[in-house]
Amino acid sequence: MKDYQRKKTKYILPAAVYHKTLWTIRDYHRLKDEVSTMITPKSGGGEGTPPSGDPGDPTYNLAVKYSQYLDIIQAIDEARNNIPREYDLGIWNNIQYGARYPQDAERSTYGHIKSRFVYEVAINLHFV
């Protein structure tokens, strides 16, 4: 699968930012899984356990990571809500799995909306 950016559109990003945004979108499901496992309590700790050797405040570090993941998920969800419903699944499957666009509209229509979606995610994540 070749990831290239459409040239004749107003949603142009630098190549590195475009690819970084695509891979951030592709990481969506892992981030959702990480967030769901972060909020489950973990056993261990307490007075009888040996120190972990990790410097700093592990609770604070976990909270920062949790907040960063939620910001990324929210940025992707906000941009995805701006995609017309009839094109949403086709664009999402194309980015996530490399699936072909459905035959219900022109490829150029899907390509234009995909470039706008990737551009909006990059803006929401403050990549540009």
Language model feature labels by segment:
Residues 97-109:
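Helix-turn-helix DNA-binding module
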Residues 82-97:
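Short amphipathic alpha helix immediately N-terminal
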Residues 1-82, 125-128:
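N-terminal interaction/assembly modules
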Residues 89-92, 106, 111-113:
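Domain-scale macromolecular recognition modules
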Residues 110-128:
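DNA major-groove recognition helices of helix-turn-helix
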